[in-house]
Amino acid sequence: MKRAGLALALAAPLMMAQAKPVLVPDVSQREIEIAYSFTGAELLLFGAILLPPGEPRADAHHPIDVVVVVKGPSESITIREKEKVAGIWINADRLRYSSAPSFYAIASSRPIRDLVDDRTRAIYELGLDSLQLSPTSSAPPDVQDRFTRGLVELRQRNNLYYEAPHAVEITDGVLYRARMNIPARVPVGKFTAETFLIRDGKVLGAAVRDIDVRKSGFERFVARAAERSSFLYGLTAVALSVFLGWGAGAIARRV
């Protein structure tokens, strides 16, 4: 009884000091393993909203909204624009980005534009049109915009970038959950799942959980071999190709 009373006494100041809403998020999978037969996965993001004393509960006039953003590791990428010359498609202009998320998916309880203004969207990178990409050249703004749209559209076609408005369900203004699809072509690396609590056009709280996407089985062995000993990996690949070619030729001669 004394220990319980002491715990309550220690927790009381923390509870009284809570001046802002707090998010307690989690994800259904902290690790996603990619094997040869991997066809994609469904990720469940869920959690609770802890309102401080005196904070009104969600209602029709002052709703509480939740936005979840899943990001893959950043990478450098070069986007090339093709041009048709004399009936042949050739590479024309190009623009290199030093940093672009390899995967970006955003789910929200309502459309993002209904929740916050343009400035807030840009600060927190809420939405595909608010991604802060980093072109390495000093190309004119209209050229940068054209290439950025091309990059986003390319990754949308591969299901690596997408938006899912109304995909976050909030229950009684306290619990929330969202299901997000991870495509088969997802890159490996350290992912983050960021959750934002929004009310009256302001971000009141945020929390992050990490997700590890990695190869497993034979694919993991091959990837590690390529990273740790690229020279031996190259020799092995060449030797294997020669052996398979010789074997195919021998079988063809017998037939």
Task: Tell where the protein language model's regions lie, with residue ranges.
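Extended, hydrophilic extramembrane loops/domains of integral membrane proteins
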Residues: R185-K215
